[in-house]
A protein has these predicted regions:
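Conserved, structured core segments of small domains
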Residues: 1-98
């Protein structure tokens, strides 16, 4: 199953994240290596959030990520939520089209 982790972020997020960016990316590395974190990045125009795509049996993988993400711990993320995403089109889709 796929899960989307949505982050709401502080104003000037792109500038304010710089001191913590390396820690955030290093924190993400094991999730990527295990195949749990598929894609992620900031939204653009305006940069008012970020979205990360996870693969797992439950939404706990995305919740676990958010709970200890340096961006969350340092107050750059003002709120987050996880939503299940039923994927049906494209490589890696969870539900195949007939």
């Amino acid at each position: 199953m796929h899960y989307l982790l949505f982050y709401d972020v502080v104003p000037d997020y792109v500038i304010r994240r710089q001191p913590f960016r390396t820690a955030h990316l290093e924190y993400a590395r094991p999730f990527i290596q295990r195949g749990e974190l598929v894609l992620g990045g900031a939204l653009a125009d305006p940069v008012d959030g970020a979205v990360l795509l996870f693969r797992g049996q439950t939404p706990d993988v995305a919740r676990t990520f958010a709970a200890a993400d340096p961006y969350v711990a340092r107050g750059l993320v003002t709120g987050w939520r996880v939503r299940p995403w039923t994927t049906v089109v494209g490589p890696g889709a969870e539900v195949s089209l007939p």
